[in-house]
Amino acid sequence: MDIPSVDVSTATNDGASSRAKGHRSAAPGRRKISDAVYQAELFRLQTEFVKLQEWARHSGARLVVIFEGRDGAGKGGAIKRITEYLNPRVARIAALPAPTDRERGQWYYQRYIAHLPAKGEIVLFDRSWYNRAGVEKVMGFCTPQEYVLFLRQTPIFEQMLIDDGILLRKYWFSVSDAEQLRRFKARRNDPVRQWKLSPMDLESVYRWEDYSRAKDEMMVHTDTPVSPWYVVESDIKKHARLNMMAHLLSTIDYADVEKPKVKLPPRPLVSGNYRRPPRELSTYVDDYVATLIAR
């Protein structure tokens, strides 16, 4: 179904710093969803994504979902929840590393084209060709000419994808500077998330307004009627995930696919001609759990 383009001018969360605007974050003071309600609704939406997957697989639909936003905005967390129960043969994540020297000598979009879905597939881009409009522009990884060319070519490129039948959805996760900094500090001392904190993340703290200007310019040129940007307020992660997931599902006219009835065959009778090898001939892992129970 057709969804009107979001007016990005209302997304104040991602513009001037909170110090300049006189507030800290959009999250404090807002009523937050309870964990029980969140978990129940998350599972319901995940069930719908399984239905969407099966519809795509049977209908041959091709879906591309782009996740963009500042570092620490919650893109990866949303992708993780969407794909938790999906078939990796149908739905996959494209998270490309920095381009190689060879890729730098290609047409800019070429390395992304290789990851586009075939018939019946879903691809979630954890960052995408929009790197050129963000980090590459701000950090000087592309020339001014390459940047201008990107802004001119991208609407044409996306129109080509859509004309060929690809369902393209683009989401910008909008986080306040105060909340981004809080998340970075939390990662700093978290042994399982510290790897997420890169030198580029730290640099983005000091270049907040540069990234804001780059984002605004990107929206002006690439938020088109056929390929709009949808802005997700993401200071509250759980709200952002549910809002984004529900919205994405609402933009696609998918349908339930009749499931084949599965009948398990009866297990054959033991013939008596097979004997399991003695246990001591195999190398078993230690019963680590037993040590926990004994404590």
UniProtKB/Swiss-Prot annotation:
Gene Ontology biological process: GTP biosynthetic process
EC number from the UniProt entry: 2.7.4.-
Compositional bias ranges of the Polar residues kind: 7-16
InterPro entries linked: P-loop_NTPase, Polyphosphate_phosphotransfera, PPK2-related, PPK2_PA0141
Stated induction or repression of this protein's expression: Expression increases during the exponential phase of growth and remains at a steady level up to the stationary phase.
Reactions catalysed: [phosphate](n) + GTP = [phosphate](n+1) + GDP
GO cellular component, one term: plasma membrane
Effect of substituting G74R: Loss of GTP-synthesizing activity and lack of autophosphorylation. Does not interact with Ndk
Annotated Pfam families: PPK2
GO MF assignments: GTP binding; polyphosphate kinase activity
Residue ranges, annotated region (Disordered): 1-28
Keywords (A to Z) from UniProt: Kinase, Phosphoprotein, Transferase
Name assigned to this protein: GDP-polyphosphate phosphotransferase
Protein encoded by which gene: ppk2
